[in-house]
From Swiss-Prot:
PANTHER family per UniProt: DNA REPAIR PROTEIN COMPLEMENTING XP-C CELLS, DNA REPAIR PROTEIN XP-C / RAD4
InterPro entries to which the protein is assigned, alphabetical: BHD_2, DNA_repair_Rad4, DNA_repair_Rad4-like, Papain-like_cys_pep_sf, Rad4/PNGase_transGLS-fold, Rad4_beta-hairpin_dom1, Rad4_beta-hairpin_dom3, Rad4_BHD3_sf
Localization, UniProt: Nucleus
Annotated family: Belongs to the XPC family.
Organism: Schizosaccharomyces pombe (strain 972 / ATCC 24843) (Fission yeast)
Chief location bin: nucleus
Functional note: Has a role in the nucleotide excision repair (NER) pathway. Acts in both transcription-coupled repair (TCR) which removes damage from the transcribed strand of active genes and in global genome repair (GGR) which removes damage in untranscribed DNA. Involved in the repair of UV-induced damages where it is involved in the removal of cyclobutane pyrimidine dimers (CPDs).
Record's protein name: DNA repair protein rhp41
SUPFAM superfamilies assigned: Cysteine proteinases (SSF54001)
Length: 638
């Protein structure tokens, strides 16, 4: 039989590959560096041992490196739980960041920014209601485009904004976005320079001061709860900051141009400072300022942008203050590419001036169910958790208006109109569709017709709705859920469990377990003298489950028949230990066992209190005796 630990029936174990470096037969040369920077560590252990030898005649340095084997760490359920909790906490922190910056955008000290906007643009943002709908819409969009062009000329991007974080790399304080207080937020606005995120927030403040209903939109760059690619993030995309390059130049120039390092270690790393994100991709927007000569590397797609309400069309219009005017109102142009390592679109929240937050992710992503696998809603509790969050920060239903109803209808239409993905990778873990190859070990397609086909290198494969997928479990698993296999029921499928073949059954092949009743005040027991009580329905007819702390002592005191209740199992170090909770007795003794259990519990608490008082008195006696001895010693011997 299979234990509860095998109920997931995963096809493969998950592992983290730690690339500790593999030797390469090629001999490489490089400028000499400080030897203290040539070692790396994982979990605090040094993985590279160096034995440098120096001959300053011709200045030659030889470094031998002893390389350990490639290490593999198994991913446990605790690791997954920790990452999920980090994901949830990071999501809440970024949401709070959005709410805070949105409040700062409404500060009165930013009202002066309106003076940079020409009068013609101000008029275009408020077209006359006497004109036709088409003209008002065109005039409003023209005003937004002019405002974007003015703001791009006025504001200079000098620092990095928020980027996609990675687990594999530590935070680099020189590369993260600016950290501002409210005073600095308002004061720095006079400089008209900073990160792209900061400039977008000032742009939202300008629109609101121009009496244009504006929402600040934030694509939350949340740490993922998945492990796939976690190590690649740490080693594949590395950068060389300015201080590291300078150290390299200084070291090589101080000794000699002929200095070199002979290494039997493959050429794969530069000396780097750990960073908070990957900055080595050429598809990012590189901006070099004239004042600081600082290279600002940002994703081509924004993390912050704004939505301005178009009264003519009664809908929100998306605007990137530092993008091209052609993307105004085109939601899908804001989604970053899947190869963009600086920006990911998982959660997109929009916040109004009144502080109400709304999830508008469906509006900006082409395939919502493709990114759903990276959201917390993919878990059974995820949707309820998100609803609980938005019940605090979302707009109450009582405050809904026509434009909210129109937007909700549009989001629902986008969700329902999404079709079958075109590639196999997107179909994996898809919440609506499934391929037979992606089924878990305990899953099978029992009934139902296919809803589509997809071409693969092995031919044509059928696509099925996920609602037709049935989960099969062993008879032992169903028994622990209070169900047994129906007589003559056929298994859903058979799987190998060691040398045996284990049949798996779906819920339709099971029925509710009916335990034997209590007869003559005798409780039915299993082979171990206990009673299985995994769910309340497994309690026998005529029995009573006493969960009080002293229930066992009370049953022994009354000298009645009882059975210890096994309510589950604790799995520790690959061994299962039954979890006992109270006793089961005849319902006839319910009142008596409750009363006796409470009395015994009270007596034990009183006895424990007496022991505590006795121990305290003994300790006080010891302390006072010691003080008396100390005083006598000082009096007699000074």
């Amino acid at each position: 039989m299979m234990s509860d630990e095998d109920n997931t029936y995963s096809d493969d174990e998950e592992w983290l590959d730690l690339d500790l470096g593999l030797p390469n037969n090629d001999i490489k040369t490089a400028p000499i560096l400080n030897s203290s920077l040539l070692s790396s560590a994982v979990h605090g252990e040094r993985l590279i041992q160096e034995r440098p030898t120096h001959d300053f005649g011709d200045v030659e340095a030889t470094v031998d490196r002893t390389v350990e084997k490639r290490s593999r760490l198994k991913i446990t359920s605790v690791d997954r739980k920790i990452r999920l909790q980090i994901h949830q906490l990071h999501l809440l922190c970024l949401t709070y960041h959005l709410c805070t910056r949105n409040t700062w955008c409404d500060d009165n000290r930013l009202n002066y920014l309106v003076k940079y906007i020409p009068p013609g643009i101000r008029v275009s943002l408020h077209p006359s209601s006497q004109k036709s709908q088409m003209i008002r819409n065109k005039t409003f969009l023209h005003g937004l485009a002019g405002l974007v062009e003015v703001w791009k000329r006025k504001y200079k991007i000098t620092t990095n904004g928020l980027r996609k974080p990675n687990y594999g790399l530590l935070q680099n304080n020189s590369l993260i976005s600016e950290s501002l207080s409210l005073e600095e937020f308002c004061k720095n606005s006079k400089l008209l320079s900073g990160s792209r995120d900061y400039g977008t927030q000032l742009f939202a403040s300008i629109l609101r001061n121009l009496n244009v209903p504006t929402r600040l939109v934030f694509s939350l760059q949340v740490l993922s709860f998945r492990f796939k690619g976690a190590i690649n993030e740490a080693s594949s995309h590395e950068i060389v900051p300015a201080w590291s390059q300078q150290m390299e130049n200084d070291s090589s120039s101080d000794i000699s141009e002929s200095a070199h390092i002979t290494s039997r270690f493959r050429k794969r790393r530069k000396i780097i400072q750990p960073s908070f994100s990957n900055l080595s991709h050429l598809d990012a927007s590189d901006i070099v300022t004239e004042d600081t000569k600082l290279k600002v590397i940002d994703s081509p797609k924004p993390v912050f942008w704004v939505e301005a309400f178009n009264k003519a069309m009664q809908k929100w219009v998306c605007v990137d203050p530092f993008g091209d005017a052609s993307v105004i109102g085109k939601y899908r142009r804001f989604e970053p590419a899947s190869s963009d390592h600086l920006n990911q679109m998982t959660y997109v929240f929009a916040i109004e001036a009144n502080g109400y937050v709304k999830d508008v992710t469906r509006k900006y992503c082409l395939h919502y169910y493709k990114i759903l696998k990276n959201r917390v809603e993919i878990f059974p509790f995820g949707k309820a958790w998100m609803n609980r969050i938005f019940s605090k920060i979302g707009k109450p239903r009582d405050f809904y208006n026509d434009m909210d109803a129109i937007e909700d209808a549009e989001l629902l239409r986008l969700e329902q109109s999404e079709g079958i993905p075109r590639n196999i990778q997107d179909l994996k873990d898809h919440p609506l569709f499934v391929l037979e190859r992606h089924l878990k070990k305990n899953q099978a397609i029992k009934t139902g017709k296919s809803c589509g086909r997809i071409n693969t290198k092995n031919g044509v494969e059928l696509v099925y709705p996920r609602k037709y997928v049935s989960n099969g479990f062993s008879a032992e698993h169903w028994y622990r859920k209070g169900r047994i296999i129906k007589p003559g029921a056929q298994p859903l499928k058979h799987v190998k469990n060691g040398d045996k073949v284990l049949p798996l059954y779906d819920e339709e092949a099971t029925q509710l377990y009916t335990p034997k009743p209590v007869v003559a005040n005798i409780v039915p027991k299993n082979a171990y003298g206990n009673i299985d009580l995994y769910v309340p329905s497994m309690l026998p007819y005529g029995a009573y489950h006493c969960r009080k702390r002293c229930a066992l002592a009370a049953a022994k005191f009354l000298e009645i028949d009882y059975a210890k209740a096994v309510v589950g199992f604790d799995f520790q170090r690959k061994y299962s230990k039954p979890k006992l909770e109270g006793v089961v007795v005849s319902k006839r003794y319910e009142e008596a066992i409750d009363l006796i259990a409470e009395e015994i519990d009270q007596e034990e608490k009183e006895a424990e209190a007496r022991n505590v008082r006795k121990t305290c008195l003994l300790l006080w006696k010891r302390l006072i005796t010691g003080l008396r001895i100390r005083q006598r010693v000082f009096e007699e011997y000074g």
